[in-house]
A protein has these predicted regions:
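Acidic, low-complexity intrinsically disordered regions
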Residues: 1-218
Length: 218
């Protein structure tokens, strides 16, 4: 196992409900990647954009070779096949690790799942299957999963998928909330790449913003 290597998998919602947040999503993602390029250690990045279908724009690319995402890749459309995106990504990464040489298997694997709506279009995977897959990878290999959700109960949704409450957070699906997500996720990635356990308060800035502005909107 390569203790200096981290596997990072981003699953980003680009369904029609993300309309208007394209530039914030692209800008936040690119800023996070640039920051991570300067962090110590090696990292492989996979990025899956999902709507009705999943599109892989990075497949285990060295983080230092990632080019900025543009609106050619991130263009919103369609519905939300969230379960298919998660299930397909776990299956792919799991197979790669299974057949890799021991010294090539990353010591740390992190999935970051961001969505602003309910699952409504998956055909290959259901929540029971995805939950089984996530729980297997967590218990056997120590994979981490972060779930960031807007316009849904993110904590309850994550539970259905086998992701614990302390790894799920609600956020505001707007410019401020979207950019804050990437800042906070970047800090969590830095911690994981250093070999430190995921902090219990990794999501505190997002929670604070959500609660403060939820009160204002209510």
């Amino acid at each position: 196992m390569n203790k200096n290597l981290t596997e990072i998998v981003f699953l980003l919602d680009r369904s029609g409900s993300m309309s208007g947040l394209e530039s914030d999503t692209i800008g936040g993602f690119n800023a996070m990647i640039e920051k991570q390029k300067k962090a110590p250690g090696e990292a492989l990045v996979s990025t899956i954009l999902f709507d009705n279908v999943s599109e892989v724009i990075h497949d285990r690319v060295n983080i230092r070779d990632i080019k900025p995402m543009t609106d050619r890749e991130y263009c919103v459309r369609g519905c939300t096949a969230l379960l298919d995106a998660i299930g397909g990504a776990i299956h792919h990464i799991g197979n790669v690790h299974k057949y890799a040489r021991e010294e090539d298997v990353p010591a740390h694997t992190l999935f970051v799942i961001t969505t602003d709506g309910m699952e409504n279009a998956s055909r290959r995977y259901d929540s029971a299957r995805v939950k089984q897959m996530i729980e297997h990878e967590k218990s056997k290999y120590g994979w981490e999963f972060l779930f960031l959700g807007a316009n849904i109960d993110a904590v309850e949704t994550a539970k259905h998928f086998g992701i614990s409450e302390d790894r799920a957070v609600n956020y505001h699906s707007d410019s401020v909330g979207t950019r804050l997500n990437y800042e906070v996720v970047s800090c969590a990635i830095t911690s994981m790449r250093s070999g430190a356990p995921m902090s219990a308060d990794w999501k505190a800035p997002i929670e604070a913003d959500y609660k403060t502005r939820k009160g204002e909107k209510d």
